[in-house]
Amino acid sequence: MQLNSTEIAELIKQRIAQFDIKSEARNEGTIVSVSDGIIRIHGLADAMQGEMIELPGNRYALALNLERDSVGAVIMGSYDGLSEGMKVKGTGRILEVPVGRGLLGRVLNTLGQPIDGKGPIDNDGFSPIEVIAPGVIERKSVDQPVQTGLKAIDAMIPIGRGQRELIIGDRQVGKTAIAIDTIINQKDSGIKCVYVAIGQKASTIANVVRKLEEHGALANTIVVVASASEAAALQYLAPYAGCSMGEYFRDRGEDALIIYDDLSKQAVAYRQISLLLRRPPGREAYPGDVFYLHSRLLERAARVNAEYVEKFTNGAVKGQTGSLTALPIIETQAGDVSAFVPTNVISITDGQIFLTSQLFNSGIRPAVDPGISVSRVGGAAQTKIVKKLSGGIRTALAQYRELAAFAQFSSDLDDATRKQLDHGQKVTELMKQKQYSPLSVAHQSLVLFAAEKGYLSDVELNKIVDFEAALLSYANTQHAELMAEINAKADYNDAIVGKLTALLDDFKATQTW
């Protein structure tokens, strides 16, 4: 068969018409330096702030410095095997982490990868780690409580859903203990918890996970870990990753609680990255944007209104508000709350729980200093019964602190002063609480009622703890219905007062103290 020139030309035209090539534009650059977890890249045009940059060996870096002729990026993980001259690619994406209910009960790293050996996670999708916080119009005022189960906090420094309450104090004064007790107390409250461990020893984190599991609270909790041995970039990003996981519940009309343990170590990791990127240092060698580092994170903790939830879920959830409550932890050096990072976070949050070494070492645990601890919005969220009964407790402790200072210089005190000092000592003793033993609203109310109505006046100081234990045991066995009623309604009226009075009178009649 012979083809003439016309047929050949037609065939070529057909082939050309059918030929389809897809042009692919790739943003590539070359590594010009590698040192201390920082790479400088030349030729990576159109890079975004915070963009993921793909490195050889399926590793990633985060673009943080965008300069005229180079990009400074921080490597997320190990930088072994990277060298000058290697090619890198821009991905055009910012960092996203998996979110969803399948994360509950799991231990994850900053990137949302499981590290607990329980297999792959079942996530509902991905969320960017940097999200703009809800606006003023989308928020709702805080008016529902988060019960920590700790008398000293729920009575005097109440926390509401959507609040940011700072836990601040020196090392080894029980900051993490308060956070873990709060998580344990949420196992039946419906509040989902996220615990972000930043720069801690792996053994400490393993102990926390074990305690949560023992008390049945791990199934309700996501644990995000950036341990002390991990790269500074992962420690810096861990709180944002945890926050995105918590926002999943907030945006769907549910309540969540997130604990950042602790933000001092995150600030140190960010300072390290900034200095290596040659950004100008400021006070205490922190970069100028260290306030923004924490403010953009903590502003994402909020109570959002029903309209926001309905719009976010495209009408799937109606008439429900969502909340994300944050308990950031800050470690001070020798009680110095006027340092740079502590003052920043105090000004961002809605109050602080201040723990002191002096109280801790004298056996008052939790070592909460009620004089300088404050909750700026929690009062509106306090349960009715605890709010009514706790007012006198705060006053009694304030008067006791004032009188105790004067009593040191005076030996002859009048009866009224002596009674006030005695009452203050007993209330201080009553505020003590063992770790991993949170109390219900009914139990707290009963203890506060006993203190408020003078039932402790004839109980010796060294028997207060035993008195409390016996009282709660008696209430559980003899007055279980009343305890259940208070837990369900938390009302304070004449009928409840009458029942509580009868309970305490019966208890005092059956036992001598």
UniProtKB/Swiss-Prot annotation:
EC number of this enzyme:
7.1.2.2
Name the residues annotated as site: Required for activity: 373
Per the record, the similarity remark reads:
Belongs to the ATPase alpha/beta chains family.
Q: Which UniProt keywords apply?
A: ATP synthesis, ATP-binding, Cell inner membrane, Cell membrane, CF(1), Hydrogen ion transport, Ion transport, Membrane, Nucleotide-binding, Translocase, Transport
Q: Where in the cell is it found?
A: Cell inner membrane
According to UniProt, the name of this protein is ATP synthase subunit alpha
Biological classification of the source: Bacteria, Pseudomonadati, Pseudomonadota, Gammaproteobacteria, Aeromonadales
List, in alphabetical order, the Gene Ontology terms for molecular function in this entry. Answer: ADP binding; ATP binding; proton-transporting ATP synthase activity, rotational mechanism
Gene3D superfamilies in the record, alphabetically? 2.40.30.20, ATP synthase alpha/beta chain, C-terminal domain, P-loop containing nucleotide triphosphate hydrolases
Q: Please give the function described in this protein's UniProt entry.
A: Produces ATP from ADP in the presence of a proton gradient across the membrane. The alpha chain is a regulatory subunit.
Q: How does it sit in the membrane?
A: Peripheral membrane protein
Using the record for this protein, list the coiled-coil segments as residue ranges, or answer none: none
Q: What is its main location?
A: membrane
Chemical reaction(s) catalysed: ATP + H2O + 4 H(+)(in) = ADP + phosphate + 5 H(+)(out)
Organism whose genome encodes this protein:
Aeromonas hydrophila subsp. hydrophila (strain ATCC 7966 / DSM 30187 / BCRC 13018 / CCUG 14551 / JCM 1027 / KCTC 2358 / NCIMB 9240 / NCTC 8049)
Q: Which GO terms describe its cellular component?
A: plasma membrane; proton-transporting ATP synthase complex
- Per UniProt, ATP binds at 169-176
Q: How does it assemble?
A: F-type ATPases have 2 components, CF(1) - the catalytic core - and CF(0) - the membrane proton channel. CF(1) has five subunits: alpha(3), beta(3), gamma(1), delta(1), epsilon(1). CF(0) has three main subunits: a(1), b(2) and c(9-12). The alpha and beta chains form an alternating ring which encloses part of the gamma chain. CF(1) is attached to CF(0) by a central stalk formed by the gamma and epsilon chains, while a peripheral stalk is formed by the delta and b chains.
**What is the superkingdom listed in this entry's lineage?**
Bacteria
